[in-house]
């Protein structure tokens, strides 16, 4: 019951702030899971919204220069460095609405960027 009330309250705040002619500044807030989806439905309306769950990191790793020799020839140190770089590359690529609005607070203008 409390979760439903919190969800309804969050949507009401977004609705009031996004009402045309409203002089209030949209407060940035964390929106995750169903709260994020509901906020997108509210903000985007009939236009709908798009969502790309996770970009393929392997496509971007194809831009890296080929390795000279294998991990055995290069030594264990290079193998560790290679895996650390791949993790760092994945962190740089994984950006989207979840990172923008769930991990960090976002406002109504951020949500509008995901509308069709």
From Swiss-Prot:
| GO biological process annotation, one example | glucose metabolic process
Secretion signal, residue range per the UniProt entry:
1-24
Q: What InterPro entries does the entry give?
A: Insulin, Insulin-like, Insulin-like_sf, Insulin_CS, Insulin_family
Tell where it localizes.
Secreted
| Short name of any one Pfam family annotated for the protein | Insulin
Instruction: Return the PROSITE patterns for the record.
Output: INSULIN
Q: Which family does it belong to?
A: Belongs to the insulin family.
Query: By what name is this protein known?
Result: Insulin
Q: Which organism is it from?
A: Lophius americanus (American angler)
């Amino acid at each position: 019951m409390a979760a439903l009330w919190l969800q309804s309250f969050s949507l009401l705040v977004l609705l009031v702030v996004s009402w045309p002619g409203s002089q209030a500044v949209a407060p940035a807030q964390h929106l995750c899971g169903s709260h994020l989806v509901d906020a997108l439905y509210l903000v985007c309306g009939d236009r709908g919204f798009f969502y790309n769950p996770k970009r393929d990191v392997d496509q971007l790793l194809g831009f890296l220069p080929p390795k000279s020799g294998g991990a055995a020839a290069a030594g264990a140190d290079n193998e560790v460095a290679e895996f650390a770089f791949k993790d760092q590359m994945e962190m740089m690529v994984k950006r989207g609405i979840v990172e923008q609005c769930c991990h960090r607070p976002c406002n109504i203008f951020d949500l509008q960027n995901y509308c069709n």
